[in-house]
Amino acid sequence: GLGWLDPLFQLFRSGNWEAIGALGEGVVGAFGQIMVASVALLIAWRQVLVDQRLTTQQNRITQAQTIDSFIHGISELISDEEGMLEDWPLERMLAEGRLSAVFGSIDKDGKARVLRFLSHAKLLTPLKRDYRLGRAILDGEGSYEEDRAAGVPVIRLQQLLKGVDLSGTDLRGVDFNGADLRGADLSFCDLTGANLAGTNLAGANLEQARLEECRLFYGRPQTATPRLGSAPFDLATGAGTGAVVENVNLASARLLDPQSHHYLATWSGPRSRSTLPGGTKGVPSQLG
């Protein structure tokens, strides 16, 4: 099995020390070259890792600057010299255009940060307006009065979030105000306190999403129905105020309250009902 070593044994037995020395130098030289090449490869690999880390950090810095610039620009665009909200139709269109542009250059965590800012600043919430100039009306408590029935938001999300990947992001308290979320990936999201009433969630992924205190409709779950385009709705009964939830993936969705569970069991359809935590026993489907 070691016959391939016979030439070496013969060389040593011959006593030809010059040949033995030459062989030793060759072996040591080859081993040294291998070691040098290995060290060079290791250094090159470490350099690649360092470059990747620096690139990632630079991208984060650039994204943070982009978001900060967007927030500053929007704030200046829709406020007057006294710091009051002033959003004429052109300014609202420009604000929506800026939002659409910035969404194309940031990752999902950046998108979530922008959505939280817009929502907490009440720029996505329909606001009560006066009927002469269309200005937002103060509520007497340092904020602007909401008007879910006939109000106008500063920014409409419309189809901006359709099919967007927001998985694993922090969307707590975001007011989506009827946005089109068809096919969006909201898996593992924290949607605590978010307002999804009137949104279109058809085909969206809510696997393991946290839905604590998340609003899917107004009124009562027994009388609430999904929104139908621009059809009239009733905030008291909930008719026409609910989210469209057909074919939503609800596997392992967390902290659903009984009202939301009832609504989802009623209006999500057979595919979604099979993924709804807690089952659907005793709640008939309205979608067949």
Segments from the language model and where they lie:
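Tandem repeat scaffolds
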Residues: 13-41, 133-288
